[in-house]
Amino acid sequence: SVDSWHTKAFSDVVKYADEQGVCVTIPSPGDIFSFGGASVEFLGPVQDYGDDPNEGSLVARVRYGETSFLFTGDMGFEAEDDMLSANVDVSATVLKVAHHGSAGSSSSEFLEAVNPQYAVISVGADNDYGHPTEAALNRLSALHIPVYRTDLLGEIVASSDGKTVTITWETETATREEPSQTADHYDYVGNTSSKVVHLATCGKLPGETNRVYFE
């Protein structure tokens, strides 16, 4: 049932929905509904993962025109593998990276299947879990997927006109350094023109005049 997972946040949502006379239902893979000019299709979970709320995360893809956005919750390798084994089409323009960039999510095989133009990691700065992990970031980097992180860039907005997606952000943490600085002293290097964040070890860093550095 919709109230079988007991957390305060979830209970508050169910309570508020009840107060508003809204019926809360559990979607199934294949369910589609319209949201303005967009459509939302639920792709997973494709298996019952019992009491594991992470692997049992809802997976949904929002389509608008020729663009799409994949939301993966906190799913891990097991749920990813099951979706791929079930031949679920997970391709998307933008991937919201699972589980804040956990080491146990975003396998290379899954990332290849999604083949996103952009990846967004929603994660708090200096969190206790060490997210996003170097393992997840390395897998994204190996496939040359541009990554945008809320802990480095603040609020991130992905806008679609139905044909292309534009990524913008608002941050107070990024500081522009003089060209004499080098990536050796930093963990991440941003491109002020393309708005892409690279690992400092990436072989495709922007020119010095287009760099912004993050520790």
Predicted stretch roles:
Residues 176-215:
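Mature, structured domains enriched in cysteine- and short glycine motifs
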